[in-house]
Amino acid sequence: MDKLAIQASPPLAGDVIISGAKNAALPILMAGVLAETDFIVSNVPNLRDVSTSCKLLRCLGAEVDELGNGQIRISTKNLNEFCAPYDLVKTMRASILILGPLLARYGTADVSLPGGCAIGARPVNLHLHGLEMMGAKIEVKEGYIKARVDGRLKGAHIFMDMVSVGATENLLMAAALADGETVIENAAREPEVIDLANCLIAMGAKITGVGSATLRIQGVERLQGCEYRVMPDRIETGSFLVAAAVTRGRIRCLKADPASLESVIAKLEDAGAKITTGEDWIELDMEGKRPKAVNIKTAPYPGFPTDMQAQFCVLNVLAQGTATITETIFENRFMHVPELIRMGANMELEGNTCIIQGIESLSGAQVMATDLRASASLVIAGLVADGKTIVDRIYHLDRGYEHIEQKFQGLGAHVERVQ
């Protein structure tokens, strides 16, 4: 099994090209099921979850051609299976996003209950309740969600009990082909939801309120394929910016989207970083200074993203001062803390809050990745730890970061993949 071996590295310096956003690419690939003609998606990152999504679409009978250079073409003309099996779904939570498109276009869907990162319950009841309000008959048995509808789904007024990115995306795709108007209140406002909505509009969907907490979808009878470019990955961007801040370096993230990262950029500036942005680039310069501690509280967009919490834990571990980090989105999302403590971090957990006293340096150790973003935080810690750090179970990392070791090497880091 692959591992990453990391040696203490100089301050990161140079340019890094940001990949397409995994969390936008996955729902957009699933939206291909809604299109009656060929659908071409570009800027798709080369990641395990993307490969799993392509396998799932092929398993349903869709033709999926990987055209190279981050382009994927999907044709549904021979789609004739409506079951997303356990062996595919268990490795990737986003498989649940096939439910809305299959049900809306074909009236039937059997989807195994999902797997993915083990960071809390992440219930699917919001997805199911919304689809039931649109007329679906749903039962959960033998580990599968079995959904049926006679004719088309019907437009409905849906109020989400809590903000859920996945449920918003599933219901948005389902509503695009429903009969009548659907209103989704308390909808997620994440940039990846906006990207999906813009893709659906390019296919012919009628959606207003994009980017707000109230989405209005006027269902249409059919959607056509189009060519669509996936947005840049804001979490990958943020991860590299934090790595540069922790190593007291200066880097530029190219093909990035500064507008999607305002809360993260604000916290990096609070930590002492000098940040300059252009339309599609972000430069961070620590001017050789140690970062200052910053308090963080995760929240749905436009608040601070939960997917950047672990990386800021590392920043605070090595910062000047004391900070608290409070996680409000997922339980179980401090699994990186025991690993960082093994490297010498001064951290204490109190419920959903982590109290961190900054220290001067960490010591290299053998550590274990437990989920996608936790593994990124351990890599960043390894860059500044004395000696050698080995990060085990990096298959988690490969689910969300494209060519991570090559990108770090390009910035001067001592990182290599080993067996």
Swiss-Prot record:
Keyword presence, Transferase: yes
Enzyme class: transferase
Disulfides per UniProt: none
Subcellular location: Cytoplasm
Gene Ontology annotations of biological process type: cell division; cell wall organization; peptidoglycan biosynthetic process; regulation of cell shape; UDP-N-acetylgalactosamine biosynthetic process
Predominant localisation class: cytoplasm
Enzyme Commission (EC) number: 2.5.1.7
Catalyses which reaction(s): phosphoenolpyruvate + UDP-N-acetyl-alpha-D-glucosamine = UDP-N-acetyl-3-O-(1-carboxyvinyl)-alpha-D-glucosamine + phosphate
InterPro entries, alphabetized: Enolpyruvate_Tfrase_dom, Enolpyruvate_Tfrase_sf, MurA_subfamily, RNA3'P_cycl/enolpyr_Trfase_a/b, UDP_GlcNAc_COvinyl_MurA
Active site residues per record: C117
Example of a GO cellular component annotation carried by this entry: cytoplasm
GO MF term list: UDP-N-acetylglucosamine 1-carboxyvinyltransferase activity
Pathway in which the depicted protein is active: Cell wall biogenesis; peptidoglycan biosynthesis
Sites of 2-(S-cysteinyl)pyruvic acid O-phosphothioketal modification: C117
Record key words, sorted: Cell cycle, Cell division, Cell shape, Cell wall biogenesis/degradation, Cytoplasm, Peptidoglycan synthesis, Pyruvate, Transferase
Chain positions recorded as phosphoenolpyruvate binding sites: K22, N23
Binding-site list for UDP-N-acetyl-alpha-D-glucosamine: R93, D307, I329
Family of this protein: Belongs to the EPSP synthase family. MurA subfamily.
Function: Cell wall formation. Adds enolpyruvyl to UDP-N-acetylglucosamine.
NCBIfam families documented for this protein: murA (TIGR01072), PRK09369.1 (NF006873)
Official protein name in the record: UDP-N-acetylglucosamine 1-carboxyvinyltransferase
Organism: Shewanella sp. (strain MR-7)
Taxonomic lineage of the native organism: Bacteria, Pseudomonadati, Pseudomonadota, Gammaproteobacteria, Alteromonadales
